[in-house]
């Protein structure tokens, strides 16, 4: 079981191309905090990233920088410049017809691909929100990422049949590659960090068991046996890596799976309850109400109004 792939699938983490920025001369753009992650890929020239409380960061051609959901920031052509508001009318036009968004008065010297990643708001597994600080990856330090950026740039430069599908797939690949870089750069396990838990083999193996068989009646004891450690060791690793008990994670994962199925399918509640490990619909409904604040039927109705 590929734990990361399954978590990305269930969390609904999907990327899309926002706009292509072409800028020249003096330019600066202020971007409000949004409930989605942002990835800026510089395909030509140089861009400076401005994040409150951080030093301006130079991002060169072939580099990319990923920002966690809710990160207000600015991008500009210099380390010291005025950041102006986003021209919403021009942005909407660019999003609608696929044209570039032009900034500055001089001919374009810099080109930036602005990508966005959203996570299903009904899912609580914090994949994207684990990326707390801006992460800058240069073209020199990661050959795989460089090739992916080149592929994305080439696909956008010469659109053809299937370009939309290809671009979306490449954007999703970029997210996986950034997660890999994050795991390499942060070998320590930070409490409460879901991605950090991927560095802990005990927790990672336990998550793989839960993700592969959510219907199994998992307990701390059975998970410990499946990962060949004691219950005390398993609990200690979970608290250190995720800030919660094994049982709490199992329940959270089951509720995420159930939430998606309630919204996206017409499966009976009884069928869903068994699929996520509950012996009876009553037990499932009780657990679901505790987690989501309402019974499964009401939850499904609310999302389908």
Task: Locate predicted features.
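Hydrophobic residues on short alpha-helical segments
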Residues: 39, 153, 207, 256-259
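Glycine- and charge-enriched low-complexity intrinsically disordered segments
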Residues: 100-112
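Generic structural signal for alpha-helix termini and adjacent loop/cap motifs
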Residues: 45, 78, 155-158, 213, ...
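Short helix-to-turn junction characteristic of helix-turn-helix DNA-binding domains
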Residues: 42, 210-213, 261-262
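Generic protein-terminus/edge-of-domain signal
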Residues: 1-64, 71-103
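Basic/polar phosphate-binding segments, predominantly the helix-turn-helix DNA-binding elements
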Residues: 177-183, 205-256, 273-302
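An amphipathic alpha-helical interaction segment
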Residues: 111-125, 129-208
């Amino acid at each position: 079981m590929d734990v990361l792939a399954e978590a990305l699938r269930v969390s609904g983490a999907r990327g899309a191309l926002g706009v292509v920025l072409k800028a020249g001369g003096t330019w600066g753009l202020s971007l409000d905090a949004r409930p989605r992650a942002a990835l800026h890929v510089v395909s030509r020239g140089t861009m400076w990233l401005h994040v409150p409380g951080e030093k301006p960061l130079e991002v060169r051609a072939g580099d990319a920088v990923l920002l966690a959901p809710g990160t207000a920031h600015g991008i500009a052509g210099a380390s010291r410049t005025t950041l102006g508001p986003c021209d919403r009318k021009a942005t909407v036009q660019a999003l609608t017809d696929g044209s570039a968004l032009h900034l500055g008065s001089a001919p374009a010297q810099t080109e930036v691909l602005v990508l966005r990643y959203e996570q299903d708001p009904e899912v609580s597994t914090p994949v994207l929100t684990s990326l707390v600080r801006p992460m800058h990856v240069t073209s020199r330090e990661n050959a795989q990422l460089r090739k992916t950026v080149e592929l994305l740039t080439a696909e956008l430069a010469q659109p053809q049949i299937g370009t939309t599908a290809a671009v979306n797939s490449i954007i999703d690949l970029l997210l996986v590659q950034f997660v890999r870089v994050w795991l390499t750069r942060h070998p320590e396990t930070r409490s409460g960090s879901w991605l950090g838990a991927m560095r802990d083999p005990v927790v990672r193996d336990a998550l793989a068991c839960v993700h592969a068989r959510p219907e199994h009646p998992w307990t701390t004891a059975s998970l410990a046996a499946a990962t060949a450690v004691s219950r005390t060791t398993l609990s200690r690793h979970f608290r250190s890596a995720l800030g919660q008990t094994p049982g709490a994670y199992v329940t959270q994962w089951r509720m995420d799976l159930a939430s998606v199925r309630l919204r996206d399918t017409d499966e009976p509640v009884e069928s869903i309850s068994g699929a996520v490990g509950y012996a009876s619909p009553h037990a499932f409904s009780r657990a679901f109400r505790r987690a989501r604040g309402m019974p499964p039927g009401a939850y499904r109705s609310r999302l389908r109004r």
